[in-house]
């Protein structure tokens, strides 16, 4: 489902040619892309979307749609994606993770990260990371709180056992820090 508001115009092309084309690297990787299918986000309440500017700016994007957008916006560049589900509690996470893994299998994305929930057992997590095409994990505070900047600690949404497993497997963790102060917060 491409967004109705996305229209690439002659003005856009001209701006790209005059201001961006020669400044852009020939190859780049977007290391933070959310992909999903409509059924993965069907249960996200409308009020949740209205209360969060990020959710209002495009909750749904398939890997195919992402390719269309990137090809349109960056016609002279070779691009690749690191992608993962939208990491909020109401998403059908297991199905969305499967979709991300399949997209990595087919080469639609370069790297897929598994969005993890704190309640996942270490055994389940290890099985998924071993048997499916995931290059790392994406824990997120929303899996505990449902609120941005919530006053929770890192190990509430990424238990020590999960961290130990991904360290053992040598996998990266892409993490948004919790708490309103983010990086400078002493509890982080």
Language model features with spans:
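Histidine/acidic-residue-rich catalytic or RNA/ligand-binding cores of hydrolases
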Residues: 39-42, 184-188
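Active-site gating/metal-coordination segments in enzymes
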Residues: 2-12, 80, 88-181
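Well-ordered, non-membrane alpha-helical segments in soluble/globular domains
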Residues: 55-70, 93-102, 155-160, 185-188
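An N-terminally biased module of ancient metal coordination in phosphate/nucleic-acid-related enzymes
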Residues: 1-86, 91-92, 130
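Solvent-exposed, non-transmembrane amphipathic alpha-helical segments
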Residues: 48-55, 101, 120, 149, ...
